[in-house]
Every structure is written in structure tokens, then in C-alpha cells.
Amino acid sequence: MNWKNFVCSVVCLAGMTCAEAVNYTPENVSASIALKVPGNDAKRYPLTLQQLDNSNFEYQWVAADKLPVVIYQNVEEKDGNQRIVIFMTALDDVYFNFGEQVMTGCHHDDCLFYMPGFWYRRNLRSPQEAPSFHTSDSWLVREDRLSTPLTAIFDEKNRKTYSVIRLDNMASDALTTHKEGEVILSGKTSIGYTGFENLSGIASLSFGFPYKEAPKTYIRKLTLAPSVEAYQLLRKGESLSLTWELHESEIADFSECVQHIWEYSYDTNCPQIVNTPYSPEKMKEVMSNFFVESFVGNTPTHYYSGVELRTATCDQTDVAEVGFVGRTLLNAFNALEYGEQQRRTDLVTNAYKIFDSYLQHCF
């Protein structure tokens, strides 16, 4: 036997994460549907998951009251994961918002959370005016806020990761007349929501359709606004299908959790290169015009004017900023590097003017 290959195999196996299915049972899941008549407050109906026999569907979500919509569900095993497929048919015209929660069995206080591009651990390094545990330990957000429509929960104590990802095609969105509260969509959207919630001390994965954001919505930098919940019209006889996938893995630490989730997301979504009409070289050439049009050289310290820029006129302003938005010195370095590569003496000259002015006059 080739001992070198054997040892390599053992090392590779030791480094692999162990994927297994989330324990999706009626005892671990809950759901509700909110129905709204325009002009009136929505009414939320708790749903119970009932197993079906002699049917094309495994389960049906039912309420204590008769609803103008029927909701069926299948749970499919796929590569060690569980796919949740919802089938919804309207018996009458109805505006709805559907949500589901899957309890992980982990104590919420033992968990860290990850939503790609939006949430890391508990977001405690973010200001109180941004989404974080400073405001709440439970957050639901629109899927299109994230790099991929996924939420992951990492149990530090038991070293396991649980995640939910939306698998439907995100192809459309619709406008609303309001930005908070219960809002009626002007058309059809494909945007749902994802997040995590503390349910009586247990961490749960939460997801649904159409979107909602709670306990706050993050409308702009450092600005939390009241929650929003969208309602989409499903006309009588229309049907809707929604698909999510639940995934569970044994993970050593949170860093490995992030790595694993990204690899899982790529494997699941299989992103393809986007074909664009312009090459990277062409776009860099166009964007480099910023260094020309925004250069201000009639002040003691020279800079690129970009802070508080009015997009309607693109006029230069008298605001210079070294960090955050302005990044004058970083932009000067970028202009210098690009200018030298492209033999653009105008970019190189202005970049050195900025550096020299700061060396002479300081900040």
C-alpha cells in the first residue's frame, strides 16, 4: 500500500466537515400566514403541519379557521440536505405573507450568526444605529440585502452549523407606496426574507415570502426605521411554489463556518460569469475620468472632490476627506498606479500634487 497516499487521505478526511440533515419534524417547525384586506390591518393565522396520506404532497399547513388559500408542503432529501417546497393555491383573491420557523435545538446564547454581506457573529462591532444585538437578538431581512439569500447559525458549544438558503429564481420585484408597516406590493416580487429568531431561548432559522424586515428595517447608513411587512396578491386559482434548503454540518469554529457556508453557497448556486458589453479595461478607462473631473488643485491641500457630490450636476465641492468616503490619499494612489500602467501623465501628475501638498501642509 502507498503510505503517502494513505496519510494524505487521512488528513483530507480529518479536515472535511460532516454534513447531515436538519431534524425537520412537525415538533421542530412552526408557521403562520398573515392575510390582509387593503385598508385594514392584517390578521395572522398560526398554522399546524399535518401529514397526509394518499396524496401528492407529504404535508399540509392548516389553520383553526378556514382560509382562502391552501398550503401544501413536501420535504425532499437532496445530497444530505432537506429541501422545503411550498405549494400555495388561492381559493379567492388574497393578499398574503407566509413565514416558517425551524428550531435548531441550540441555546440562542450559545450561537453566532452569519448572513453573507450583512451580519457577522452578533454584529456588536456595528454602531447602535445599525442592525446588531445592541437592538435585538432576532433579525429578519430582505433576501436581496445579502450576497446570497442565506442565514447560518453556528452553535459554539456543540460546534454545529445550521443554515437555510432560498433556491428560487430571483427575477422580479415590485414597488410599494410606503416603506414601513404593512405594505401592499404593486405587482409580483420574487424577494422573500430570511433571518434568525430567539424562540423561548432556542435559536431558530426563519424564512418566508414575500419579504419583511423586523424588528427594524435598515433604510440607509446608520438609520433604523420601523419594521416592514409586504403583502402580495394571489388571485383566485393562481398557484405559487417556493423552495428553501436546510443544511447542517459539524464545524470546528466560526471562521470555518464562514468558509464552509461560502463554499456551500457557491456549490448550491453555481454562479456563472456575467457577460457584459464592456471589458474591464474599458470600464477602468471610463471610471478613471473621475480622477480628472474631480481634481481640485486651487487649495493648499489638493484633493479629489467626491464627498457630498450632487449627482444631478457633478459639480466639485469644497469638502475634502482623507478617510471613509473621500479617501483622497487612497484615490491618489489608485490614480498613480493606473496612470503609470496606462502612461497617463495627467493622472500621475495630479496624484503627486496631492501627495506633495499633504507632505507640505499636513492635515
Regions found by a protein language model. Name each.
Residues N2-S9:
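Sec-dependent signal peptide recognition
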Residues S241, H247-E248:
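Long, charge-dense tracts
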Residues V322-L329:
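Signature of short aromatic-glycine-proline-rich micro-motifs recurring in repeat-based ectodomains
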Residues N23-V29, K36-D41, T48-K236:
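Beta-strand/loop-rich accessory regions of lumenal/periplasmic or secreted enzymes
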Residues N28-A31, N40, L234, E238, ...:
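Low-complexity, Ser/Thr/Pro/Gly-enriched N-terminal "stalk/linker" regions
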Residues A14-Y24:
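Bacterial Sec-dependent signal peptides at the C-terminal "C-region" and cleavage site
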Residues L329-T345:
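Well-ordered alpha-helical scaffold segments within catalytic/enzyme domains
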